[in-house]
Amino acid sequence: MPTAYKRVLLKLSGEALMGDDAFGINRATIERMVADVAEVVRLGTQLAVVIGGGNIFRGVAGGAAGMDRATADYMGMLATMMNALALQDAMRHAGIEARVQSALRMDQVVEPYIRPRAIRQLEEGKVVIFAAGTGNPFFTTDTAAALRGSEIGAEVVLKATKVDGVYSADPKKDPSATRYTTISFDEAIGRNLQVMDATAFALCRDQKLPIRVFSIVKPGALKRIVQGEDEGTLVHV
């Protein structure tokens, strides 16, 4: 069956790996996510992943607690490295070939980020996991997703969250909140909808790189998106 996308960038938050736990990596949760990824890989869509680290350490929180913000952000990057290795390991157990490329060098453990190599690995059918954000403090992993997505020529950034799209208001607080099927970047800015942080959002808008926000908790959602079905919210130019 033909797919809607040839190459996609999946943004996974660190918190998504926790499942119902308060901290760390929930093995059952990561295995379920990998099963979803496996379905997409089998369809022939090239998949890259940018992973966060908030389940282990958040640079913003460290900065707020009195730690030097740059130091806290570097600690957050190391947290993403741990998540990337866990994800790669789970993929290996599921029979998926995956490579981790890091914006911070840790040569004994992972490959450094090299754009042509990443593209070649995607073309070979491997999943490429980008770790350590952009490699610079003060930039979120959402911004890393926008950056890497632009660099590798992804057709869409798939932002995996615990909510099934972008809503007019917080659905947990406002029962009348409605989900947008599609919305433009300018509309989202005008309505002050928090899809991504401002830097990431601006980069996607400038590069005309659409964002699809969807629920990673919803079974089969990732596969349905790749097959072109209506899932979550599409943010477009």
UniProtKB/Swiss-Prot annotation:
GO biological process: 'de novo' CTP biosynthetic process; UDP biosynthetic process
E.C. number: 2.7.4.22
CC per GO annotation: cytosol
EC category name: transferase
Chief site of localization: cytoplasm
Pfam families in UniProt: AA_kinase
GO MF terms held by the record: ATP binding; UMP kinase activity
Binding site for ATP: 11-14, 54, 58, 161, 167, 170
Superkingdom in the source lineage: Bacteria
Regulation acting on activity, per entry: Inhibited by UTP.
UniProt binding sites for UMP: 53, 73, 134-141
Catalyzed reactions: UMP + ATP = UDP + ADP
Stored Gene3D superfamilies: Acetylglutamate kinase-like
Localisation: Cytoplasm
UniProtKB keywords: ATP-binding, Cytoplasm, Kinase, Nucleotide-binding, Pyrimidine biosynthesis, Transferase
Pathway(s): Pyrimidine metabolism; CTP biosynthesis via de novo pathway; UDP from UMP (UMPK route): step 1/1
Signal sequence annotation: none
UniProt entry tagged with the keyword Nucleotide-binding: yes
Stated family: Belongs to the UMP kinase family.
Subunit structure: Homohexamer.
Primary role: Catalyzes the reversible phosphorylation of UMP to UDP.
NCBIfam families with a match to the protein in the record: pyrH_bact
Protein name as it appears in the record: Uridylate kinase
Gene (UniProt): pyrH
